[in-house]
């Protein structure tokens, strides 16, 4: 049992797992911020531009069921904003990574075949002298 706890601790404290946990927490908080932005700022402005439309009240009643397509539209706007923000973040991150990974100058590999030919020619000359 103790060995399993030690293995779990080692697994949980690996860099990738901790990075993922932090990313999930930050992502959840960012999602709440974007939802608030969409619900409280963007959609009311869009509603005013569309003639006083309140997206939170857009719905269709079918029998006893209520289909709230206004809330669905707000969720789509949420998704688009979050996806765009993630796209920009990844783009910036990859540009930093490319700058960090500057190409290492490769030392030219000596032309081994040329050296072998020179050695062969020198050996032939030495044999002629003997």
From Swiss-Prot:
It holds the Pfam family MscL. Gene3D superfamilies: Large-conductance mechanosensitive channel, MscL, domain 1 (1.10.1200.120). Disulfide bonds: none annotated. The chain crosses the membrane at residues 11-31, 70-90. SUPFAM superfamilies: Gated mechanosensitive channel. GO terms for cellular component: plasma membrane. It is a multi-pass membrane protein. GO terms for molecular function: mechanosensitive monoatomic ion channel activity. It is found in: Cell membrane. Keywords: Cell membrane, Ion channel, Ion transport, Membrane, Transmembrane, Transmembrane helix, Transport. Channel that opens in response to stretch forces in the membrane lipid bilayer. May participate in the regulation of osmotic pressure changes within the cell. Belongs to the MscL family. Homopentamer. PANTHER family: LARGE-CONDUCTANCE MECHANOSENSITIVE CHANNEL, MECHANOSENSITIVE CHANNEL MSCL. This is Large-conductance mechanosensitive channel. It comes from Listeria welshimeri serovar 6b (strain ATCC 35897 / DSM 20650 / CCUG 15529 / CIP 8149 / NCTC 11857 / SLCC 5334 / V8). The lineage of its organism: Bacteria, Bacillati, Bacillota, Bacilli, Bacillales.
């Amino acid at each position: 049992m103790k060995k399993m706890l030690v293995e779990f601790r080692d697994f949980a404290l690996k860099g990738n797992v901790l990075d993922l946990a932090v990313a999930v927490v930050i992502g959840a908080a960012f999602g709440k911020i974007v939802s608030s932005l969409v619900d409280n700022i963007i959609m009311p402005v869009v509603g005013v531009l569309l003639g006083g439309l309140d997206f939170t009240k857009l719905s269709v009643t079918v029998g006893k069921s209520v289909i709230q397509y206004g809330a669905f539209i707000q969720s789509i706007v949420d998704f688009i904003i979050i996806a765009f923000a993630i796209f920009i973040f990844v783009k910036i991150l990859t540009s930093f990574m490319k700058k960090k990974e500057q190409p290492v100058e490769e030392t030219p590999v000596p032309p081994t075949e040329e050296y072998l030919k020179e050695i062969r020619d020198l050996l032939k000359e030495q044999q002629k002298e003997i």
